[in-house]
Design a protein with these regions (language model features):
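Conserved beta-sheet core of the metallophosphoesterase superfamily
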Residues: 162-238
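Active-site environment of divalent metal-dependent phosphoester hydrolases
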Residues: 13-15, 43-48, 70-78, 116-123, ...
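Active-site neighborhood of phospho(di)ester-bond hydrolases with catalytic His/Asp-centered motifs
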Residues: 6-8, 35-40, 64-70, 151-154, ...
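N-terminal active-site segment of His-dependent metallophosphoesterases
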Residues: 1-59, 75-76, 136, 143
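Extended active-site neighborhood of metal-dependent phosphoesterases/phosphodiesterases
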Residues: 51-139, 144, 179-181, 229
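Short acidic, glycine-rich surface-loop motifs adjacent to enzyme active sites
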Residues: 141-161
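Beta-strand-turn-beta hairpins that frame and shape the catalytic cleft
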Residues: 1-5, 100-111, 142-149, 202-209
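A short C-terminal boundary segment appended to hydrolase-like catalytic domains
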Residues: 232-288
């Protein structure tokens, strides 16, 4: 029924040039419904990095949807980090940093920002998701068309992955993941850790999954440069991690995920107007 190509952590400034060029060729040779880029398009947020990233993204087939990552803030510009951390990203990509959304024939994607220009903790690379943003995203997911694949896209994994080389350490991430699952999300698609993964979100017996993407940079963390191809039909979501072997892309890992069925029927889908129990519990101001 559909296909998405997910790229992440290209990190222009230390990008893998051959892998990036081959990714463009792959995207144009492979029919798809959306090219999704989940943040960290630059390494230090320098103007020339944003220029290169923008050119690469605009060379991708349409439609495209791009969200921001923690490396997409001007690293050495303290004023920009505090006052307008995402201006350069928005100028380069043409996409808003906050509350972006894509609606296709069979898929809906909602973007949220988990990166910050600065934080009240030493490691600013870690993630944060705020309550208002969670509320707006949950409402959007609940209102997705019946039968559409529902995706929440952000840069940091909302729940911690076992065995990955680093963490997202997202403030309020566990709660947000459960709220989004309750709201009907099929996939929470992320980057940041530079290795691919797919795992279920633990909420009752529903089939919502966290899916992570590798990197197209030289900042490898135990996995070759690569990206994800997501194919789905009425019953199954197939996540294929494509890996660069030095000359071409090959299938590196495959996950076949049973697709949740409640969102395919109006009688069983989450209410588009009434917040769920977890949404009400974690977000006290949630209102129908």
């Amino acid at each position: 029924m559909g296909r998405i190509l997910q790229f992440s952590d290209v990190h222009f400034g230390c990008e893998h040039k051959h892998a990036c060029a081959a990714a463009l060729d792959y995207a144009h040779a492979t029919p798809n419904d959306l090219v999704l880029i989940t943040g960290d398009i630059t390494q230090k947020g320098f103007p020339d990095e944003f220029t290169a990233a923008g050119e690469w993204m605009r060379a991708m087939p349409e439609p495209r949807f791009v969200i921001v990552g923690n490396h997409d803030v001007p690293y050495w510009d303290a004023v920009a980090r505090v006052l307008h951390p995402w201006r350069a990203f928005e100028t380069a990509t043409g996409f808003p940093a906050h509350d972006g959304q894509f609606l296709g024939k069979d898929v809906m994607v909602r973007g949220v920002v988990t990166a910050r220009g600065w934080q009240a903790r030493p490691n600013w690379s870690k993630g944060v998701i705020d309550l208002d943003q969670t509320r707006r995203a949950a409402e959007a997911l609940r209102q997705a068309p019946i039968g559409a694949l529902r995706i929440l896209a952000c840069h940091h994994p909302l729940i911690e992955m076992v065995g990955t080389p680093m963490t997202g350490d997202v403030k309020r991430g566990d709660e947000a993941a459960l709220i989004f699952a309750e709201a009907g999300v099929d996939l929470i698609m992320t980057g940041h850790v530079h290795v691919p993964f797919a795992m279920p979100i633990p909420l009752a017996d529903r089939c919502s999954y966290a899916v992570g993407c590798g990197t197209l940079s030289h900042r490898e963390r135990g996995a070759p440069p690569g990206f994800n191809q997501i194919d789905w039909d009425a019953k199954t979501i197939t996540v294929t991690a494509q890996a660069w072997d030095g000359s071409s892309y090959r299938s590196h890992q495959v996950w076949r995920l049973p697709r949740r069925q409640d969102t395919r029927n109006a009688a069983t889908a989450p209410s588009p107007v009434e917040p769920g129990a977890l949404e009400k519990a974690f977000l006290p101001d949630a209102k129908p």
